[in-house]
């Protein structure tokens, strides 16, 4: 999930620094009708302190953190203050976790009483380790407002109510709303006031709020927020006729973590010591944004280890422990499959026994898969259950992940934990498919014959979640099927089809060392056009069916492994014309790339320009886009601008939400 909550401290620093800097999203930027007060925020951070530390060590750490806050923020000793935990806790006031109108001595004592101690908020318990201290702002209740900006598939939505504060009530029922469609400008201040501020009598406050909302939305878009709520938002008018001050007293926010490459430097700068404390000698670049775990969900040592592994690889490794005493553990390949398996377990009434949630995907190495599997097996075998435990190693049909390679890592971990698995009475159920799936399943089946642990192995002949009811005793083995049968000696069998592909075999490929702008000679273009014309009459796809048996694609990016896999699949299916027409690689000149068609070599042209590739192969109406998350928006926009392209398959993960929504709207 890309939308990650941030601390109130960080959210207010972002807003304070960029409120007057972010470029407007309106057609014209109005003159601000409000004054921005000086930002004063002090953080008391004890996140490195553990509850298992001695009382003296915890007390010393608390005093050191309080002293540091006082040293960096001398204003703490001369003003009335507000103190509260800053750990993504909702309704802190109603939970007794808010101190108002206190001096620094009272704040320190209040923090000492609660720091590194467990508290219950509703049904959730957690340890308080981070506190926010800021000046107390006295104000009448009638100047408290509520504003929220949130993102939806079709655009952004601004909500506003003229009544804010603790007793705001049902926001959805009473809020006025303003929709901002994707790629559309924000309305002018008068329109904002007419849509959202009709219940405010004061013209001064209405003007201040209208221009503040314009600025707030500018920051929201500029910094890739996905949610931003201020309650209460206070407008303080002055007796001398100066601009009213707009103060955001309480704030909750989420950022799009996948947009860190785009906005990460801005997030860091607003939180640097030079900006926060105004000292010229301080570091001008702040720390990377911290995305804390939800209250009551501190990362365990194992979760932190997998998170560290995930950060060091291009693959995806995720682990969340739900119930360490649960008897159902999963090791699922793919984010979508992890949801499907969890839903299947919950649908059978075993949600309370589900011990973990996570996934491994993106072609992790054998070593990475071993470390991931070892971590899960270690957690699983720490405690015993009378009825034993179940390990579900599941997954759909992999695109590029080598099943045999990842299974080598899992098998290595299973062998290492053999005695613990036997002692814990663990049964293992496997369902997987994809590249080299037979080799991987064969190795897993052979392991089951020698390990001393029951291992049932199933392949693509079995429904993806069929092993779940079998593992949980809700279905018999006969209902699931006989399981994996090693029926094929090799995955690319001999074929009676022609040994050379149809269109590429007739291509007159240009010498890549020559300076000709086009790779494919007219004869090749004519062959491609003839192939398209021959199938046009009976192969024209319906508007709702993007693919047919004769669909041809352009592969964007230098991905020879993926292309070879597609050609192998074509050959197995006895296609006469390969599904890959050509490749596009913008960072090199036109050339050709060697591939195999069955056991024969063939050449595919590689173009530096997408437009040139499309013109040379007018029958190709699909693009498989391997561009990275940083460049996929620009490249996909170009693809969608070509009339012949009907389908674009985006492989990149971690595309910023705002980019994805713009692509959907094109």
Whereabouts are the PLM-identified features?
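ATP-dependent carboxylate/acyl-activation modules
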Residues: 1-230, 235-390, 404-408, 412-420, ...
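Redox-cofactor binding/interface segments in oxidoreductases and associated redox assembly factors
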Residues: 83, 330, 393, 624-625, ...
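Generic hydrophobic/aromatic pocket-lining and core-packing "Φ" positions
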Residues: 342, 441, 610, 636-637
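Short acidic/histidine-rich motifs immediately flanking catalytic phosphotransfer sites
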Residues: 385-390, 616-622, 642-646
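A short helix->loop->beta-strand "cap" motif at the edges of active sites that frequently abuts
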Residues: 423-426, 578, 642-648
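Rossmann-fold NAD(P)-binding glycine/threonine-rich loop
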Residues: 440-441, 653-666
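Glycine-rich, highly charged phosphate/nucleotide-binding loops
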Residues: 599-617, 626-633
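Rossmann-fold NAD(P) dinucleotide-binding segment
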Residues: 622, 626, 630-653
């Amino acid at each position: 999930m890309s939308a990650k909550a941030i601390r109130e401290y960080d959210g207010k620093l972002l807003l304070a620094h960029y409120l007057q800097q972010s470029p407007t999203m309106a057609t014209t930027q109005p003159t601000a009708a409000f004054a921005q007060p000086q930002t004063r925020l002090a953080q008391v951070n004890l996140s490195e302190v553990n509850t298992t530390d001695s009382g003296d060590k915890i007390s010393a750490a608390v005093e050191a953190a309080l002293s540091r806050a006082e040293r960096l923020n001398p204003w703490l000793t001369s003003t009335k203050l507000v103190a509260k935990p800053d750990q993504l806790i909702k309704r802190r006031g109603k939970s007794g976790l808010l101190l108002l109108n206190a001096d620094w001595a009272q704040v320190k004592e209040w923090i000492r009483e609660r720091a590194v101690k467990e508290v219950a908020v509703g049904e959730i318990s957690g340890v308080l380790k981070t506190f926010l201290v800021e000046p107390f702002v006295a104000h009448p209740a009638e100047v408290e407002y509520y504003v929220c900006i949130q993102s939806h598939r079709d655009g952004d939505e601004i909500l506003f109510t003229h009544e804010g504060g603790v007793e705001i009530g049902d926001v959805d029922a009473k809020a006025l709303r303003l929709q901002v469609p994707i790629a559309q400008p924000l309305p002018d201040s008068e329109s904002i006031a007419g849509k959202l501020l009709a219940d405010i009598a004061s013209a001064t406050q209405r003007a201040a709020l209208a221009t503040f909302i314009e600025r707030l939305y500018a920051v929201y878009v500029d910094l890739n927020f996905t949610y931003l709520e201020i309650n209460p938002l206070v407008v303080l008018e002055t007796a001398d006729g100066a601009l009213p001050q707009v103060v955001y007293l309480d704030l909750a926010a989420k950022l799009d973590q996948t947009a860190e490459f785009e906005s990460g430097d801005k997030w860091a700068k607003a939180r640097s010591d030079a900006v926060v404390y105004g000292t010229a000698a301080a570091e001008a670049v702040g720390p990377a944004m911290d995305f804390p775990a939800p209250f009551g969900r501190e990362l365990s040592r194992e979760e932190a280890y997998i998170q560290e592994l995930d950060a060091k690889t291009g693959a995806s490794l995720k682990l969340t422990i739900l119930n360490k005493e649960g008897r159902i553990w999963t090791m699922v390949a793919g984010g979508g499959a992890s949801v499907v398996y969890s839903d299947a377990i919950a649908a059978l009434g075993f949600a309370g026994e589900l011990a973990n949630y996570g996934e491994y995907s993106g072609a992790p190495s054998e070593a990475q898969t071993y470390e991931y599997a070892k971590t899960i097996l270690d957690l699983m075998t720490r405690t015993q259950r009378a009825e034993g435990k179940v390990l579900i190693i599941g997954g759909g049909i992999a695109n590029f992940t080598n099943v045999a390679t990842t299974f080598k890592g899992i098998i290595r971990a299973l062998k290492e934990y053999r005695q613990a698995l036997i002692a814990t009475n663990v049964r293992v159920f496997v369902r997987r498919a994809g590249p080299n799936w037979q080799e991987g399943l064969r190795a897993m089946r052979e392991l089951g014959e020698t390990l001393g642990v029951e291992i049932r192995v199933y392949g693509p002949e079995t429904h993806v979640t069929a092993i779940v009811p079998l593992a949980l005793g809700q279905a018999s083995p006969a209902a699931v099927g006989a399981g994996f049968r090693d029926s094929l000696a090799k995955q690319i069998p001999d074929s009676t089809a022609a040994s050379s592909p149809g269109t590429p075999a007739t291509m007159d490929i240009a010498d890549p060392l020559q300076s000709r702008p086009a790779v494919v000679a007219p004869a090749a273009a004519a062959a491609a056009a003839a192939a398209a014309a021959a199938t046009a009459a009976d192969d024209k796809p319906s508007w709702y069916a993007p693919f047919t048996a004769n669909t041809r694609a352009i592969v964007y990016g230098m991905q020879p492994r993926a292309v070879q896999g597609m050609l192998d699949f074509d050959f197995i299916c006895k296609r006469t014309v390969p599904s890959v027409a050509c490749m596009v690689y913008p960072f090199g000149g036109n050339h050709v790339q060697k591939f195999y068609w069955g056991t024969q070599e063939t050449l595919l042209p590689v173009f530096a320009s997408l437009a040139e590739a499309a013109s040379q192969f007018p029958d190709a109406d699909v693009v498989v886009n391997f561009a990275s998350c940083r460049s996929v928006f620009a490249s996909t926009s170009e693809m969608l601008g070509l009339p012949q392209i009907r389908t674009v398959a985006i492989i990149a993960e971690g595309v910023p939400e705002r980019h994805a929504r713009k692509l959907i709207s094109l």
